């Protein structure tokens, strides 16, 4: 049996194993394969099937039965897809799931849509890191809700163009929202307090300028992913900035102390997150619920790991629908 084929099977099998478990000890050697397999199971399946067919056609397998080494990995991919399908129910989404199958099956990496205009790198402060991108529908409807997204990256890395792209495409293209994705200065060159101040300034900029793109400053929601969730919460609470709601996905919450005047929250976390474990998110939600009378919706996505919003996937489509429903409910 060819070494190249065995390596492909081994690579896919390792990714499937990481996706189906919570192995923390290999660090990025488990987190990255888990992300790729969990959110791109069809692409990974294409790779495995194509490799198997080519090996058979080239006559490098003694019999078709030799391709059986790929069956456990294919079975694991089927389980991954099944668990992703459960997100729609877990999030209490109503109606028939709307999944962009064309993108999910063929082009989960494509960055944009033709009906969405991206205004790049608007400055909200001094320096190259204090910039944001504004997304609005080509027809520029007026009086629409605004979503500001704060990226993650352990406070030391990340970029405004990396995360939440499926959500931004969905809200802007299908619902006409104005969406904004912001950068902020990164550690170790600044302090955590500086980063919180950056996010606060970004919120202020959005409130002042979003109307030029059709947004309603009175309908502003702030979303954060991973470390971005932490920064978003602190920026809103410590700055006493009024927003309509907070949306946190696979967030890191550390020792955040909730306040009784926190806005309504939607918290979505991966059941198998090895970067920011789900029990930490659940504990934070309980702390919020003890002091706040505002709605706090919490969902753990079956089988989900960290960074489940980077590609067009079955799971990200369900998350998009849940965010849209939350905004409609609160707005």
Each language-model region and where it sits:
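Primarily recognizes the serine-hydrolase "nucleophile elbow" in alpha/beta-hydrolase
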Residues: 201-261
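Conserved alpha/beta-hydrolase "acid-adjacent" motif
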Residues: 274-283
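N-terminal cap/lid segment of alpha/beta-hydrolase-fold proteins
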Residues: 29-48, 93-142
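Serine-hydrolase catalytic-loop signature spanning alpha/beta hydrolases and amidase-signature enzymes
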Residues: 154-157, 162, 179, 205
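Short beta-strand element of the alpha/beta-hydrolase
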Residues: 143-153
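Short amphipathic alpha-helix adjacent to the substrate-entry channel of hydrolases
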Residues: 161-180
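C-terminal catalytic histidine-bearing segment of alpha/beta-hydrolase fold enzymes
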Residues: 2-20, 24, 29, 38-48, ...
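Short beta-strand/loop motif that positions the catalytic acidic residue
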Residues: 261, 267-269, 273
């Amino acid at each position: 049996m060819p070494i190249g084929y065995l390596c492909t099977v081994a690579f896919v099998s390792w990714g499937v194993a990481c996706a189906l478990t919570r192995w923390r000890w290999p660090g990025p050697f488990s987190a990255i394969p888990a992300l790729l397999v969990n959110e791109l199971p069809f692409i990974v399946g294409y790779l495995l099937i194509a490799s198997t067919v080519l090996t058979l056609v080239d006559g490098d397998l003694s019999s078709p039965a030799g391709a059986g080494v790929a069956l456990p990995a294919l079975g694991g991919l089927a389980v991954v897809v099944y668990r992703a399908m459960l997100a729609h129910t877990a999030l209490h989404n109503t109606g028939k799931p709307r999944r962009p199958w064309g993108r999910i099956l063929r082009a989960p990496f494509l960055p944009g849509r033709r009906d969405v205009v991206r205004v790049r790198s608007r400055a909200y402060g001094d320096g190259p890191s204090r910039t944001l991108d504004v997304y609005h529908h080509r027809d520029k409807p007026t009086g629409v809700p605004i979503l500001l997204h704060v990226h993650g990256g352990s406070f030391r890395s990340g970029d405004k163009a990396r995360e939440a792209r499926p959500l931004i495409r969905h809200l802007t293209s299908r619902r006409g929202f104005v969406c904004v994705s912001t950068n902020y200065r990164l550690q170790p060159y600044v302090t955590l307090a500086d980063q919180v101040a950056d996010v606060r300034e970004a919120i202020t900029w959005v409130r002042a300028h979003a109307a030029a793109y059709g947004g309603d400053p009175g309908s502003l929601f702030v979303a954060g992913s991973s470390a971005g969730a932490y920064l978003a919460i602190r920026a809103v609470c410590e700055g006493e900035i009024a927003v309509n709601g907070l949306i946190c996905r696979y967030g890191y919450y550390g020792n955040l102390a909730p306040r009784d005047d926190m806005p309504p929250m939607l918290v979505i976390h991966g059941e198998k997150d090895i970067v920011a474990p789900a029990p930490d998110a659940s504990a934070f939600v309980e702390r919020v619920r003890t002091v706040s009378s505002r709605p706090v919706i919490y969902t753990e996505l079956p089988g989900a790991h960290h960074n489940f919003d980077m590609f067009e996937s079955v799971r990200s489509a369900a998350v998009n629908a849940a965010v849209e429903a939350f905004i409609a409910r609160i707005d």
